[in-house]
């Protein structure tokens, strides 16, 4: 996941970008630790203007990001439910400027492609 963020940062070429990150599955007892490490790493990308997280364990990504950043950067967490997905899509469309660089990444089990498909309609 960190490699994907690095690529998004390179593609942004000094401009702002946004990330929508979901749970990393099958981490077992290391899940909380790895999600928090990812949140810390996200905070180090100075051009990452906004972070949305989706799913149960992804909360720790957002929590760590919030601890280490300040405005004008923002983040918001959504539960990994159909209602949470609908709220994420609605909030994203209201907030993120058209044409922005966006990374959407999660374990396959989260089905984050539903988010991407909704944007392509």
Where in the sequence are the language-model features?
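ATP-dependent carboxylate-amine ligase
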Residues: 1-121
């Amino acid at each position: 996941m960190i490699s994907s963020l690095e690529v998004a940062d390179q593609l942004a070429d000094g401009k702002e970008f946004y990330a929508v990150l979901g749970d990393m599955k099958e981490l077992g007892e290391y899940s909380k630790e790895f999600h928090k490490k990812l949140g810390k790493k996200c905070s180090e990308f100075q051009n990452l203007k906004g972070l949305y997280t989706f799913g149960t364990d992804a909360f720790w990504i957002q929590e760590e990001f919030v601890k280490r950043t300040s405005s004008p950067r923002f983040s918001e967490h959504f539960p990994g439910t159909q209602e949470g997905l609908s709220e994420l899509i609605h909030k994203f469309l209201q907030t993120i400027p058209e044409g922005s660089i966006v990374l959407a990444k999660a374990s396959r089990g989260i089905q984050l492609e539903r988010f991407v498909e909704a944007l392509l309609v």
